UniProtKB/Swiss-Prot annotation:
Gene Ontology cellular component terms for the protein in this record: cytosol
Cofactor field: pyruvate
NCBIfam families from the UniProt entry: panD
Cofactor note: Binds 1 pyruvoyl group covalently per subunit.
Any one GO BP annotation for this protein: alanine biosynthetic process
Top-rank lineage group of the source organism: Bacteria
Gene3D superfamilies: 2.40.40.20
Entry protein name: Aspartate 1-decarboxylase
Its EC number(s): 4.1.1.11
UniProt subunit comment: Heterooctamer of four alpha and four beta subunits.
InterPro entries on file: Asp_de-COase-like_dom_sf (IPR009010), Asp_decarbox (IPR003190)
Keywords assigned by UniProt, alphabetized: Autocatalytic cleavage, Cytoplasm, Decarboxylase, Lyase, Pantothenate biosynthesis, Pyruvate, Schiff base, Zymogen
The reaction(s) this protein catalyses: L-aspartate + H(+) = beta-alanine + CO2
Amino acid sequence: MQLSLLKAKIHRATVSHSELNYEGSIAIDGLLLEAAGLYEFEKVHIWNVTNGARFTTYAIRAEHGSGIISVNGGAARYVQVGDLVIVAAFAQMSEDEAAVFRPNLVYVDAANAMTHTNHSIPTQVA
């Protein structure tokens, strides 16, 4: 059986640009792309924390260290500059692989500078 697990997440990034007439995609600061282990042109899910919108697109590289998170093309209608978003990607793997797999979690500040990384999410308690 193949399972779909969270591969990578950039948590609560701030949308810095929104380009309706660009060719689509989400441009992500190259430093964040690498830290998350995301590839250019990889399918990503975007979850807008500010307005609840959810959509998929593909990632492209923005300038390394720029802090750019730019939602482009038709997807630009789902965000505004300043919105908080979560960028996530999933990977398919066997049960044996899933038993030892840990995702790349990247956390950023309001300027999209990486603050820290992790490979697990704390257990939620009441």
